[in-house]
Amino acid sequence: MAQFVRNLVEKTPALVNAAVTYSKPRLATFWYYAKVELVPPTPAEIPRAIQSLKKIVNSAQTGSFKQLTVKEAVLNGLVATEVLMWFYVGEIIGKRGIIGYDV
């Protein structure tokens, strides 16, 4: 057991160095996209979002959503799934747990 611990302690700096070297470029890429994608909407984007929601409601009322191509329908489904998943992530963060609320 002591031999195992000694080997682990000797190899730890090399493993940590390799992990840092491996993750630095990926972390830089993550931060680049996080700064671009995770910003709140600007005031100029809010009217466009409202117009888009009105367009969705109108297509649901008139039935024009039936004329979508398969690609458009799949993309709309993926966007809806992404919005739903971010809602669930916010719920998990707010609850500070995956299951139930602490009351």
UniProtKB/Swiss-Prot annotation:
Keyword NAD: yes or no?
no
Q: What is its main location?
A: mitochondrion
InterPro entries documented for this protein: ATP_synth_F0_gsu_mt, ATP_synth_su_G_mt_met
Q: Which residues form the signal peptide?
A: none
Q: Name one GO biological process term.
A: proton motive force-driven ATP synthesis
Q: What does the record list as coiled-coil region(s)?
A: none
| GO terms of molecular function | proton transmembrane transporter activity
* GO CC annotations on file: mitochondrial inner membrane; mitochondrion; proton-transporting ATP synthase complex
User: N-acetylalanine (modified residue): where?
Assistant: 2
Keywords in alphabetical order, please: Acetylation, ATP synthesis, CF(0), Hydrogen ion transport, Ion transport, Membrane, Mitochondrion, Mitochondrion inner membrane, Transport
Origin superkingdom: Eukaryota
* Ion transport recorded as keyword: yes
N6-acetyllysine (modified residue): where? 11, 24, 35, 54
The protein's matches in PANTHER family, at most eight in alphabetical order, are given as:
ATP SYNTHASE SUBUNIT (PTHR12386)
- Subunit architecture: Component of the ATP synthase complex composed at least of ATP5F1A/subunit alpha, ATP5F1B/subunit beta, ATP5MC1/subunit c (homooctomer), MT-ATP6/subunit a, MT-ATP8/subunit 8, ATP5ME/subunit e, ATP5MF/subunit f, ATP5MG/subunit g, ATP5MK/subunit k, ATP5MJ/subunit j, ATP5F1C/subunit gamma, ATP5F1D/subunit delta, ATP5F1E/subunit epsilon, ATP5PF/subunit F6, ATP5PB/subunit b, ATP5PD/subunit d, ATP5PO/subunit OSCP.
Q: What's the protein name?
A: ATP synthase F(0) complex subunit g, mitochondrial
